[in-house]
Amino acid sequence: MANRENKPVIIGVTGGSGSGKTTVSRAIFEQLHGHSLLMLQEDSYYNDQSDMPFEERIKTNYDHPNAFDTELLVKQLKDLLDWKTIEKPIYDYTEHTRSSEVEKVEPKEVIILEGILVLNDPALRDLMDIKIFVDTDDDIRIIRRIQRDIEERGRSLQSVIDQYKSTVKPMYHQFIEPTKRYADIIVPEGGENQVAIDLLVTKVRDILRKREK
């Protein structure tokens, strides 16, 4: 990681679907009051598939590294590190492609980048000050995913189970779990692990203090 005096602090938070990434990220956010904060979702950077027929777009494997426009994500993170405003893409899940609209995002002191594959790409990892892997038992993750997809996304139980078996589980073991070796901190039990969250917040505050000198 290069020396980045007076630059934003970038925290990468990853783990499998339903691991508690968002809970951990929000817990860090809540404890870092007094600093400007930004949460970026890797999901916003799914590829633009507008040139593909809809029948092909619906077959997208969203758990594969090739589903993401990592080059754009790296570029926009570098812009944020230079205190530049970015135009973050917005993904349209109903159309399975990027929306024509964008969201203007201002740089902040602390940037949390959350997603299933944020530790997969070396160029992305190199921009991070702290890399976190949220490690949660497979059974707990699938239960959480079923609850979320049925309650929040209107999915059927069978469709969630089929997707889990065909893509989510194999992609986790092939691409996501191996990135654990790049993590500075592995957080078991997700957002329930208050000790790990307290340690993370202390470390972030320490980095911020050093950059303010």
Curated annotation (Swiss-Prot):
The keyword RNA-binding does not apply. It holds the Pfam family PRK. Keywords: ATP-binding, Cytoplasm, Kinase, Nucleotide-binding, Transferase. Coiled coil: none annotated. It is found in: Cytoplasm. Pathway: Pyrimidine metabolism; CTP biosynthesis via salvage pathway; CTP from cytidine: step 1/3; Pyrimidine metabolism; UMP biosynthesis via salvage pathway; UMP from uridine: step 1/1. It is an enzyme of class 2 (transferase). Its EC number is 2.7.1.48. It catalyses: uridine + ATP = UMP + ADP + H(+); cytidine + ATP = CMP + ADP + H(+). Signal peptide: none annotated. ATP binds at G15, G16, S17, G18, S19, G20, K21, T22. One of its GO terms (molecular function) is cytidine kinase activity. PANTHER family: URIDINE KINASE (PTHR10285). Belongs to the uridine kinase family. This is Uridine kinase. It comes from Ligilactobacillus salivarius (strain UCC118).
